Amino acid sequence: MNAQFSITSQGFKNNNGGDYAVYEFPGKQKAELFQAASTSILKSMTGTLPSYYSNNEDFIVLTNKVRKLVYKGISGLTAEYILRFAIDDGKITVYAPKVDLSGIANGAEILLFLDAGKTWNGRHFHIFDKEGNLKEDEIKMKLENYFNEEIENLMQLNF
């Protein structure tokens, strides 16, 4: 299955409305998948400074920061995100990204939220308004493209 997460008024969701995607690797053991996924994560993150954490072969947590990933007006917004991977024999479950977006404009912090909310509340913006209507189409598309590509690249495992 390809990870095709979309941003909805409730955050990132898969095509069925869930918060995960499952990648099948028939015949591969958990230890093999853990090693391959760990290597893929570390290779793909060259040039950035991600935090990578796993205390066993069951789960990997990756946190990363991408500066100026998207723009709100003239302000480049930094994305801080978490990707989580549950590993089992023959499959890896990738959970929807958890993303915080922030930036600075005229010396003040700007926050952009994925979920529904007021469109303007001081310097806080939302991709969807409180009725669930899309307000930031370009930002939504850029974020979806970035994270779907990121996950697809991470799941290109070499054994």
What are the functions of these language-model segments?
Residues A3-F159:
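Ser/Thr-rich, low-complexity intrinsically disordered terminal regions
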